[in-house]
Swiss-Prot record:
Any one GO cellular component localisation term in the record: chloroplast
Compartments (UniProt record): Plastid, Chloroplast; Mitochondrion
Source species of the chain: Arabidopsis thaliana
GO molecular function: double-stranded DNA binding; RNA binding
Name recorded for this polypeptide: Transcription termination factor MTERF6, chloroplastic/mitochondrial
This protein's record includes keyword Transcription: yes
Gene behind this protein: MTERF6
Keyword list, A-Z: Chloroplast, DNA-binding, Mitochondrion, Plastid, RNA-binding, Transcription, Transcription regulation, Transcription termination, Transit peptide
The protein's role, per its UniProt record: Transcription termination factor essential for chloroplast development. Required for maturation of 16S rRNA, 18S rRNA and 23S rRNA in the chloroplast. Binds to a specific region within the tRNA(Ile)(GAU) gene at a position adjacent to and downstream of the 16S rRNA gene. Required for the maturation of tRNA(Ile)(GAU). Binds to double-stranded DNA.
Gene knockout outcome: Small white seeds, with defective choloroplasts, that are unable to germinate on soil. Albino seedlings that die rapidly when grown on synthetic medium.
Entry's family note: Belongs to the mTERF family.
Keyword tRNA-binding: no
Length: 333
């Protein structure tokens, strides 16, 4: 019987465009395929394509990542999960996108995995309207153990002082991918670097994590330290760097070559400004160099206007023109 089923599923895969090496790889990955029935596989394939709305060209990729999908009973596993995910999203395409990002999400049980996960995040203060956004944006969340993975990360965040007013929930909504990192290998080393090297206070750490939690996920030696060292080379003092990182955490992950260096060079050599000014307005590194900084500097210089970086950049185009009395004609020259 197994030989017949294996032969049947082989023909199914070949009919869908899979070559023999790919089929062999899937059979090794999922032993259940050897007993899979082609009619079940075909029914599941058609459901994902016609009902869920996954593009036919993407299905081979999805199935190769999680061949188990084709062995599951449609009514028992696939349909309940898809319907539950659909209830969390605003757009049907979000479900198809989530499945494409992480195909194994379909192999998990709604009752055993998804419902407990949703309850876990709700208890952390994640609004019901944001639950779907989190799961569909990072569907891999469903694969993490609540007891051995998620709870450990929540405890770590709480140790940073984020245990009040739903702070942890807000952090996770901003960056659901944070839950995929190891506390010991990534989150704690990054936090220690921010404390010991950058000199952030406990309140500074809380501010950074609340405003830009992605910073905790970056590698210290590959990204954060090189940026910190560059800022030191530029002449910024310890307290200035701490203030800049607190005010604009992204400064530690911006490309030194493509972002920080060109802006510092323009600031000093072209604008004739001092480093102290950018230390008090680190958002300077957020603005586009050519489209915003250079164009606005040309206007204020041409009109002999004396203003701070914040006054020049911290507003939209309309308010900038109104503030300095520029007409659209003047601004175009």
């Amino acid at each position: 019987m197994e030989v017949t089923n294996t032969s049947s599923i082989m023909w199914f895969f070949r009919d869908k465009g899979f070559d023999d090496p790919s089929i062999d790889k899937m059979l090794r990955k999922c032993k259940q395929l050897e007993k899979a029935q082609s009619d079940v596989a075909s029914e599941n394939w058609d459901y994902l394509s016609n009902i869920v709305g996954i593009q036919e060209r993407k299905l081979p990729y999805i199935v190769s990542r999680c061949p188990k999908i084709l062995t599951l009973r449609l009514d028992e596993r696939l349909i309940p999960m898809v319907e539950c995910l659909s209830s969390l999203g605003r757009n049907p395409r979000e479900v198809a996108s989530a499945i494409t990002k992480f195909p194994p999400i379909l192999s998990h049980s709604v009752e055993e995995k998804l419902c407990p996960l949703l309850a876990f995040f709700q208890a952390l203060g994640v609004p019901e309207t944001q639950l779907g956004k989190m799961i569909l944006f990072n569907p891999r969340l469903i694969s993490y153990s609540i007891d051995t993975k998620l709870t450990v990360i929540v405890s770590f965040l709480a140790s940073l002082g984020l245990d009040q007013d739903g702070m942890i929930g807000k952090v996770l909504v901003k960056n659901p991918f944070l839950m995929g990192y190891s506390v010991d290998k990534r989150l704690r080393p990054t936090t220690e670097f921010l404390k010991s090297s950058v000199g952030l206070s406990e309140d500074g750490i809380k501010s950074v994590v609340m405003n830009f939690p992605q910073l905790l996920c970056r590698d210290v030696n590959k990204i954060l330290k090189p940026n910190y060292d560059y800022l030191k080379e530029c002449g910024f003092g310890d307290s200035q760097i701490a203030t800049m990182v607190t005010g604009y955490p992204q400064i530690l992950i911006k490309s030194v070559k493509n972002s920080l260096q060109p802006r510092i060079r323009f600031l000093v050599q072209v604008m004739g400004r001092g480093m102290d000014e950018v230390a008090s307005y680190p958002e300077f590194f957020h603005h586009g160099l050519k489209k915003k900084v250079e164009s606005r500097f040309k206007l204020v210089k041409k009109n002999n206007i004396d203003c701070s970086l914040r006054e020049m950049l911290d507003c939209n185009t309309k308010k900038f023109h109104e503030k300095f009395g520029f007409s659209e004609v003047t601004a175009s020259f």
